[in-house]
Amino acid sequence: MLGRSTIMESPLRFGLIGVGRHGSRYAKHIHEDLPQIDLIGLWRRNTGEGKRQARQYGCRYFHTYSDLLADKSIDAVVVALPPALNVSVCEEAAFRGKHIHLEKPMAINMREAIRIRQTISRYGVRLMVSQTLRFNGVVIALRARIPPLGPLHSLHLSQRFEPSPLAWLDRRDLSGGGIVLHTGVHSFDLLRFLTGMEVDKVSCWVNSVVTKETEDNFSAIMTFEKSDIIATVMGSRGTKGRNGLIEVAGENGQLIADHVHNYLHEVRGMEWKPIELGNPVPTVYEILKAFCDSLCREVPFPVTIEDGVIAVAIAEACYRSTETGTWENVSYP
């Protein structure tokens, strides 16, 4: 089947595939904040909850995602499922001519990420990966202040959360991995977004604090192509507290921020200068709006398929490092 034209007119007609914890955030913003989207229908595995949500949002409940994708009135879909399902759903969506907003991680491994990329190319539709931290107000403000730091020396990123209530996250057959894949991809993408450089080598360690099948705690050291910058990345889903720490150090000073607690400081010598920030930005709203704007204006997505593929490539290199106990190269396709 040939993909539909990439030029769209507002309101765009959307379907939601997966309306659980993450998918519900998309549904809420579409219903309350995005008049440029007309929600046609949704599907989730829990039929009772799916029907209730369809009534709540004034749309149709589809009994299978294939039925939703077969609806010719739908222009685009948001896919927010356990990532082991992404390949089959994206292949069918592309075949049906639907543009795709895909929740991260794009895939559970490089093989499946490349397969999705090939599918999108074959059918002429468009896909954007939901790397929402690029739209965080703290991240945007920090990125704008990096050039005055001069040559960069090091970066440190840390994301920590409480144990997840989602049972499927600790089922490897559905999740494909633990915090390296599901949260690490945010940090891996931010390294590239903040520096404009590609990660070259990684050395990674993992363990399990609460989980049984997957890791919920990791630390990694990363180096970059054509640069002496050293980065450390950490993540945990086993503590009773949250953070989203970002530290960037350059020749002329440092930036220290937290995208969870909404603060940013410039550091020169012993002086910490707080940077005034607005209220926290709802990143799901911002990225959905950007997805719609890009479709309607026929301009590139701010997060590309390649961005999604590369985040998975870095995660895969981390997993190889945990197995070999050595530095591993990031394999770029």
Question: Over which residues does each language-model region extend?
Answer:
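C-terminal helix-rich "cap/oligomerization" subdomain common to oxidoreductases
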Residues: 1-11, 76-79, 122, 293-333
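Beta-loop-alpha module in the N-terminal Rossmann-like domain of NAD(P)-dependent dehydrogenases
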Residues: 26, 57-119
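Active-site loop of classical SDR/Rossmann-like NAD(P)-dependent oxidoreductases
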Residues: 45, 278-289, 303
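Basic phosphate/pyrophosphate-binding loop/patch that engages nucleotide-derived ligands
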Residues: 118-126, 140-153, 225, 250
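Predominantly a Rossmann-like dinucleotide-binding segment in NAD(P)-dependent oxidoreductases
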Residues: 133-211, 325
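N-terminal Rossmann-like dinucleotide-binding module
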Residues: 2-57
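Contiguous beta-strand/loop segments that form the cofactor/metal-binding neighborhood of enzyme cores
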Residues: 182, 189-262, 285-299
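Hydrophobic residues in well-ordered beta-strands that form the structural core
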Residues: 63, 101-102, 127-129, 257
